[in-house]
Regions:
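A flexible loop/linker signature enriched in serine peptidases of the S9 family
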Residues: 41-51, 71-77, 92-100, 116-124, ...
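A short beta-strand motif characteristic of beta-propeller blades
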Residues: 14-21, 62-73, 110-118, 163-168, ...
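N-terminal targeting or regulatory segments adjacent to alpha/beta-hydrolase or S9 domains
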Residues: 2-7, 278-362
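Serine-hydrolase catalytic core recognition
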Residues: 232, 236, 322-438
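Conserved beta-propeller blade repeats
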Residues: 23-35, 70-90, 119-135, 170-186, ...
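Hydrophobic beta-strand positions in blades of beta-propellers and related beta-sheet-rich domains
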Residues: 37, 50-52, 83, 98-102, ...
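Beta-strand-rich domains and repeat architectures in extracellular enzymes and scaffolds
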Residues: 5-55, 72-82
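Short loop/turn segments that connect beta-strands within beta-propeller blades
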Residues: 56-59, 104-108, 157-160, 208-211, ...
Length: 438
């Protein structure tokens, strides 16, 4: 191909402002339940409504959330964990009133939490259903008229026949109430202001009594200097969790009061918990633990075999992954790559075969115009090392003069933990295809 010689920054590109403005859905979260897979979509063309979608075993997809409902919670303001699933029954928080609703199949959702005197004063998130299907355990956030905000864990009947009862309180923040498969134990995370969950959290465990009250609770892990992420119970009722006690978020488990690391490595199995419902590991029927871990800014997929202290990687072209779940044998997740936007994926953990189920948007851009990231690092103040992705100018139609360097756009993240991900950004490609480095 004959390339035109033109200055960096002056190249013509097929990626236009109109390309960037194309409205596409966004996948918020995903979870397997029974023989179905559910995910939540944010739909800009429906006014930013959050819609729960169900994929049946035969591959058909159905919108679960009816028009007029919006499956979104405002607990901790950032939300997440807006839905819980029990076979064909869905429980979700509704954005307009922040109440909890129960929806059986295609029936109209029924409100199961009381109406507060002040609108939006009671909010619910991150719920789980007891194994017998009779009770729900949720994080509840109450906003008082004087501005005081109270977080607590509550239990309520699945049919909403009585009001929620508080079973854990006293800390400023709660998350991740998780019920053991045998229904006998409850684990949860909590922390106090001014700590953030990536600074220090506490993991607590208590017996879950037959009347849904809690027995004597004990702190299992965590504290002001230890961040705990995603506590989960294995099918054998063994508590697992991610901890940064080694300065890396690694996976641990507790057996008979002893805590042991499963696969120590210089990688992050956790991430900052801005929202509820994050999932970066799950349990397969084979006894393996499937996991997502981050190294050098890229996400990788792997499995930990029973009795082994290492992770076996699963080859995967997707480098940004979230919401890892399983139907028992296959892995389900939301994945993206430098050349492809978010996609619902089904992955065979044995041979790594990937099936694309649903793309967030169909992007009609020739891959030759796509710049892929190079992980770089450089020294910064206080003898620290900064990390970044570099996207080089990329356009098959142009080349720059040999003695010229490209203009560089430097995009810094906002907030204390925000970071770029290794996934397609048309905004980045808009500039790189015109001869800018980013």
């Amino acid at each position: 191909m004959n390339q035109k010689i033109a200055a960096y920054g002056s190249w013509q590109s097929p990626i236009t402002a109109a390309t960037l403005a194309q409205a596409g859905r966004r996948f918020v979260s995903l979870q397997c339940s029974g023989d179905a897979v559910y995910w939540v979509e944010l739909r800009p063309l429906e006014g930013g409504r959050y819609v729960i979608v169900r994929r049946a075993p035969d591959g058909t997809t159905t919108d679960v959330t009816p028009k007029g409902y919006n499956a979104r919670t405002l607990v901790h303001e950032y939300g997440g964990g807006m839905a819980a699933f029990d076979e064909g029954t869905v429980y979700f928080s509704n954005f307009t009133d922040q109440a909890l609703y129960r929806q059986d199949g295609a029936e109209t959702p029924a409100r199961i939490t009381p109406t507060p005197l002040t609108p939006l004063a009671q909010r619910y998130a991150d719920g789980r259903i007891t194994p017998d299907g009779k009770s729900l355990v949720y994080v509840r956030e109450i906003h008082l008229d004087d501005g005081t905000v109270i977080n607590e864990i509550v239990v309520l009947p699945a049919d909403g026949s009585s009001e929620p009862a508080v079973i854990a309180s006293g800390y400023d923040f709660y998350s991740n109430p998780r019920i053991s498969p045998d229904g006998k134990w409850l684990a949860w995370l909590c922390w106090n202001h001014p700590m953030m969950p990536w600074d220090g959290t506490e993991l607590w465990v208590a017996p879950l009594e037959t009347d849904s009250s809690l027995g004597s609770a004990r702190r299992t892990a965590g504290g002001p200097q230890e961040s705990i992420f995603q506590p989960e119970w294995s099918p054998e009722n063994i508590l697992h969790f991610v901890s940064d006690r080694s300065n890396w978020w690694n996976l641990y488990r507790e057996i008979e009061g002893e805590i042991e690391v499963l696969a120590p490595m210089a990688a992050e199995f956790g991430e900052p918990q801005w929202v509820f419902g994050k999932s970066r590991y799950t349990f397969l029927r084979s006894g393996h633990i499937a996991c997502i871990y981050k190294q050098g800014g890229f996400d990788y997929l792997g499995v930990i075999e029973p009795g082994k202290a290492s992770v076996t990687s699963i080859p995967c072209a997707f480098t940004s992954m979230s919401s890892l779940s399983t139907d028992g044998t296959a892995l389900w997740l939301i994945g993206a790559s430098p050349t492809q936007g978010p996609t619902v994926l089904r992955i065979n953990p044995t041979d790594g075969r990937i099936q694309e189920i649903q793309r967030a948007a169909e992007i009609d851009v020739n891959p030759l115009y796509i710049s892929t990231p190079e992980a770089i690092e450089f020294p910064t103040e206080h003898d620290k090392t900064a990390h970044a992705f570099y996207y080089a100018p990329t356009n098959p139609d142009y080349a720059a003069p040999d003695d010229e360097l490209p203009p560089l756009l430097v995009i810094t993240h906002g907030g204390p933990t925000s970071a770029t991900g290794a996934q397609l950004s048309l905004t980045t490609q808009y500039w790189t295809s015109r001869g800018f480095g980013v």
